[in-house]
Amino acid sequence: MLSKKKDTQQSCMFLGLEDMLNQKHPMYILANKVDWQMFEDSFSRLYCLDNGRPAKPIRLMVGLLILKHLRNISDESVVEQWSENNYYQYFCGEHVFQPCEPCQASELVHFRNRIGESGIELILKESIRVNGNDSDDSTASIDTTVQEKNITFPTDSKLHRKIIDKCRNIAEKENLPVRQSYTRTLKKLSLDQRFRNHPRNKWKARKADRKEKTIAGRLVRELERNLSPDSRYQSDIDLFKRILNQKKSDKNKIYSVHEPDVQCISKGKEHKKYEFGNKVSIIYTQTTGVIIGALGFRNPYDGHTIEPALEQTERLLGKRTLKTLIGDRGYKGKRQINDTTIEIPKPFNNRKQSQYQKNKLKKQFRKRAAIEPINGHLKTDHRLNRNFYKGITGDNINVMLAAAAFNFKRMMNKWKSSFWLEFKIQIVDLIKAMFYQINNNITRKWAF
């Protein structure tokens, strides 16, 4: 149910947040630039009008999502810091200071699930609109990177131990009979599995791994016998069987029990041979530096990500503005999609090209490398490095929120730098005026 609008009439005894805050602060400016009414109109139809408990204001929830990725903090931290920060409260639509927390951290989870990927895409679209004409660049760079999932490094031993723990929990929850719990056996096996890289312990550890897999299979079969075929745990049992039956050379393996959609991606990095998560595509304007596209995939070939990424960019911009898209050598394939030309580095053997055209392309290829540190900023500053959201939907939500936070941060830095530039100019003018006054006084003093 939608909440009623609060009475914003100011008490005569207290100042409102608008009067207390610095109106040149970037957060204050951003709060007045964002079109909050657009979010109200888009998300209000997702609520019941006359039934249920009144929900939290839509502006509050959208503002908390933006602040979370803008400041790189968790759901719990953003809710806690909101009650301590006047600018956060003004950004989320409050008119007077509120000393209490605005909501429970779990309500952000429900709100993300309510608005879905289309709602998060609206936030990204608004971040592009706030950047104004900077997003109207006809040339952009495209690149893919890996968004790692919040899972441990997968090994067969870890997966089998997880299966054993899950089977025990299900049996305990449903009061099912268990022939043997294997508590002491597993404790001994875990000791044998330690220091497996030592030559003396290698064969002992492998034997312990095989025994652990056997125990996991026994518990799964016993669970299957005791449960009916149409039980709610049937999907879990099928997942356990897939993990136990998969071989080293199989494709589409499962690397996590609680995140079965995780992909193993190798980008050729020396320091990190394999990464476990999903591939994301980023489109970044070359001249102005605005992210105009951020889309999640599984693990396709880079060239196959261009068309869906361009479709999303057209949705976000509302028009086809990209004439040239610059990629690396991994984007071999189509050279033209609709009105957009795809350019990748290659030897300049075409005699039809003039020297001017060759130099122009070389400059664009050099500019394309600027997207690499952008990927780094998205990971370290805006929570793209490790994705804590659940499932494939969580993968797509996280990358779009990170891109939106990057765009908002870009404008905040721009406003901050313009404020300091104006401040420096005023200081210089003041110093010039002081010297001019001193010079006039000296001239007047020594004049005859």
Task: Enumerate the language-model features and the residues they cover.
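Charged, often Cys/His-bearing segments associated with DNA-binding zinc-finger transcription factors
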Residues: 1-34, 41, 413-448
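Short, conserved catalytic/metal-binding motifs centered on acidic residues
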Residues: 25, 64, 78-79, 104-108, ...
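Basic, short loop/linker segments at the boundary and entry of helix-turn-helix/winged-helix-like folds
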Residues: 26-66, 70
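Acidic, metal-coordinating catalytic cores used for nucleic-acid/nucleotide bond scission
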Residues: 51-56, 86, 325-334
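Active-site- or DNA-interface-adjacent structural scaffold in DNA-acting proteins
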Residues: 95-261
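Flexible, glycine/threonine-enriched loop-and-boundary segments that flank and lead into catalytic domains
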Residues: 256-272
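Electropositive, glycine- and tryptophan-enriched low-complexity nucleic-acid-binding patches
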Residues: 270-316
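Helix-centered, glycine/charged polyanion-binding patches within enzymatic domains
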Residues: 324-393
